[in-house]
Amino acid sequence: MRVDGRTNDELRPVHIEPNYLKHPEGSVLISIGDTKVICTASIEDKVPPFMRGGGKGWITAEYAMIPRATEQRNIREASKGKLSGRTMEIQRLIGRALRSVVDLQKLGEKTIWIDCDVIQADGGTRTASITGAFVAMTLALGKMVEEKKLPALPITDFLAATSVGIDGEHGIILDLNYIEDSKAQVDMNIVMTGSGRFVEIQGTGEEATFSYEQLLDLLTVAEKGIHELIARQKEALGSLAEQIMQHCSEGEEAK
């Protein structure tokens, strides 16, 4: 048994609360175990200067942690006057991941701003941010369709992320909490679509190596977890999830 009593391939309890805030076009509070992230999606009728006139939209993300999201208070990065390398890496990861499942041409010259604010951290904050941000973005785009600002959802597939790792005591484990992450011999973050295609694989040996066979096993366990996360996304999205599934089916038939 793991530190919190889970089996090796078991996610922590997942809860996605849609429309968590009243002002953003899309928002959720996602809780994965004791990790909690507020994700919002805001839409602007303009794109960055480098994209003007191209007819395509853009998706960008910001990520932050409140000072007491962790056991010891952290100084706000705004107070330091610059973002850490970790924060910049995570922001880029969230933006890249979401752009992979949106038809930016159909979005038109609009920018979707994703804001992910970690209010409690216990491992897996970047993967929780991606999983929650997808739901917030879908809610925002659904509102645009409802208001007839878009003819249809420009989303091509579902998207979620999780972590996997190798623990010296338990072997391959899914969805690492902070204690497990700090002790893992191998740590990996996986982003996948609903159709099982990889968007990002970030894997590191922590003073250890891992074999090709272990890599395949890690990916298999991650895929299981991501399918379960997408099932939770579908529950939170309701009829919007059905629209995405219909779009995916039409895309398969067109191939």
UniProtKB/Swiss-Prot annotation:
List, in alphabetical order, the GO biological process terms annotated in this UniProt record. Answer: rRNA catabolic process; rRNA processing; tRNA processing
Q: Provide an example Pfam family for this protein.
A: RNase_PH_C
Q: Nucleotidyltransferase as a keyword?
A: yes
Q: According to the UniProt entry, what is the EC number of this protein?
A: 2.7.7.56
Signal peptide position in this chain?
none
Q: Which UniProt keywords apply?
A: Nucleotidyltransferase, RNA-binding, rRNA processing, Transferase, tRNA processing, tRNA-binding
Function, as annotated: Phosphorolytic 3'-5' exoribonuclease that plays an important role in tRNA 3'-end maturation. Removes nucleotide residues following the 3'-CCA terminus of tRNAs; can also add nucleotides to the ends of RNA molecules by using nucleoside diphosphates as substrates, but this may not be physiologically important. Probably plays a role in initiation of 16S rRNA degradation (leading to ribosome degradation) during starvation.
Quaternary context: Homohexameric ring arranged as a trimer of dimers.
Q: What is this protein's record name? A: Ribonuclease PH
Organism source for this protein? Anoxybacillus flavithermus (strain DSM 21510 / WK1)
At the highest ranks, the source species' classification is: Bacteria, Bacillati, Bacillota, Bacilli, Bacillales
